[in-house]
Amino acid sequence: MTKHLLSIMLVAVCVTACTISYKFNGASIDYNTTKTITINDFPIRAALVYPPLATTFNETLKDAYTRQTRLSLVNSGGDLTLEGEITGYNLTPQAVTEDAYASQTRLTVTVRVRYVDSKNPANDLDRTFSAYRDFPSSSMLTDVQDELITQISQELADLIFNATVGNW
């Protein structure tokens, strides 16, 4: 009886002492050492410029880190730092028909990202990310641009998050 009670108490102590945390976003951050992140605004350095892109992208990227992690966003000196620029904003014809007209147009946004992990420099990253959306050529870009930029910015933020702290 004493051995049985001792075994139960030992299991109870082990279960309460050990915790397993799994996040479906895949974030692999050691919150004991990494507490802050600095995300500098990404300016547009592309030949073709759509001014609302910078604001939409910057806010979406910051939201990705603040909503999916416990990191505090700071203006400078973060344990993690993200910076870069929007290097491409391109429209290309897709799905050319037999009469040599494109039935689809592709909007592609390219971003160069520099990621610095001051606690673990082996995680540092300097990489380019791209995302695109196709839309019917019969639509005016001005009619679909804002929605496409929102979707592309979200995809880019997810790609960057996964490449930096997502451990994917």
Enumerate the language-model features and the residues they cover.
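Sec-dependent bacterial lipoprotein signal peptides
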Residues: M1-C18
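A structural "domain/chain start" motif
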Residues: A17-E59, D63, R70, K119, ...
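Short, glycine-/polar-rich solvent-exposed loops and beta-turns at beta-strand/coil boundaries
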Residues: D30-Y31, V74-L80
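Second-shell loop/turn segments in exported
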Residues: P43-Y50, S139-E147
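Surface-exposed short loop/turn segments
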Residues: R67-L71, D79-D124, Y132-Q145, Q154
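Compositionally biased, intrinsically disordered linkers/stalks adjacent to structured regions
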Residues: Q145-W168
